[in-house]
């Protein structure tokens, strides 16, 4: 019974994690990476972003009507920075794509990979018994796939059923 | 950096004998046409032959000189080496389409191909412009002055010559590949396709567009004169235009500031207030565009129309204002 609940909770957790938490964690993980990796692309991207923001702030503080020359100079600077920033952000997004994929893969191994190992290791262990006479023999044979004893529900089938129910309901 | 301000006249344009194309542009109502006419008059004094072209659909040249101009270059009455013409970029492309429609009517294929070709944004303007340039080149003028449309759209296509070229190359590649198929099909259907001619035309255009581009980016041959008035919006537009021109690599080093109240002893309260505002923006212009020739043109009491008035006015572009 414990094993049954454990498997169900594991499936529930994986489902919820994939649906609500994963993207957030991947983004956070990427931010941490970008911060501490010391890669020059990310650094100059961040620098540019900061410069862009401060220029924008300056621009908002200068009245275009009263100090047009100053305003126009700032505006030129802003435009220049913007072009550079966009170029850099293209490079960074290409690079970040790879990093994010890697983080996702790690999460995948930790969650789904773990479930797979559990399922593989316990492929012969039954989860619970089907009451006798409830189902015909061929149905029992299916429920026991791949290696559990006939008359019992295997881990693989139980996992499959849990996933179906969870993804339908949640 | 303390540089002497550059002289505030357009004399530098008269002295630069290599100049072939001069564009005059700015927002509507700032005196573009007056400025371009005046500049043309001054240019005609130092050059062999000058052509003034208006690409503005509103056609102000006819009004300014009091003579009707059309698509053909015509001498302006009272001048021996100054001609003018008015073209409408949109109308000329329409004409071209209609022409090819007439040549082969009831041909569904060519219509489709044309739609496809003209789906490229701005291509109509670019093609019309290339057409005009071809004509102008064959006419052999010493110097050509363009009075551009208020939005400066005439120059927009300079932004995407490469896009245009790529698109055209792709299209012509497409026809050479599918042309035989289309021909066969239309042969079976009993229609007669010759979509080749429009693409041949486009290929020709492509050549002239890229050549025109090359010339426009050469500061020895081409320059752009910005016209503005000393007001915020006009200034703002001018700054944007100058940035745009810089991004197209088109030379610009002259700004004409029109409609200025330059008399310091003016008495009427409204004039004093207006003068104060103009001076404020003028000082900003001088600060921002220190490497430009800033031409200060006073507001004149009457409308500048007719050859005589224009000739008199044109002097103000060359000789700075002195209080009478």
Swiss-Prot record, chain A:
Compartment(s) of residence: Endoplasmic reticulum membrane
Gene Ontology process terms (BP): tail-anchored membrane protein insertion into ER membrane
GO MF term (any one): protein-membrane adaptor activity
Residue intervals on the Lumenal side: 1-3, 129-152
Primary site of residence: endoplasmic reticulum
Entry superkingdom: Eukaryota
Alphabetized UniProt keyword annotations: Endoplasmic reticulum, Membrane, Transmembrane, Transmembrane helix, Transport
Subunit and interaction comment: Interacts with get3.
Annotated protein name in UniProt: Protein get1
Gene that produces this protein: get1
From Swiss-Prot, chain B:
Primary residence: cytoplasm
UniProt-annotated location(s): Cytoplasm; Endoplasmic reticulum
Gene Ontology molecular-function annotations: ATP binding; ATP hydrolysis activity; identical protein binding; metal ion binding
Keywords noted in UniProt: ATP-binding, Cytoplasm, Endoplasmic reticulum, Hydrolase, Metal-binding, Nucleotide-binding, Transport, Zinc
One Pfam short name: ArsA_ATPase
Binding site for ATP: 27-34, 231, 258
Active site annotation, chain numbering: 56
GO CC, any one term: GET complex
Coiled-coil annotated spans: none
Keyword set includes Phosphoprotein: no
Protein's GO biological process: tail-anchored membrane protein insertion into ER membrane
Residues that coordinate or bind Zn(2+): 268, 271
Keyword Metal-binding in record: yes
EC numbers, comma separated: 3.6.-.-
Enzyme class: hydrolase
Family per record: Belongs to the arsA ATPase family.
Oligomer and partners: Homodimer.
Role, per record: ATPase required for the post-translational delivery of tail-anchored (TA) proteins to the endoplasmic reticulum. Recognizes and selectively binds the transmembrane domain of TA proteins in the cytosol. This complex then targets to the endoplasmic reticulum by membrane-bound receptors, where the tail-anchored protein is released for insertion. This process is regulated by ATP binding and hydrolysis. ATP binding drives the homodimer towards the closed dimer state, facilitating recognition of newly synthesized TA membrane proteins. ATP hydrolysis is required for insertion.
Descriptive protein name: ATPase get3
Organism: Schizosaccharomyces japonicus (strain yFS275 / FY16936)
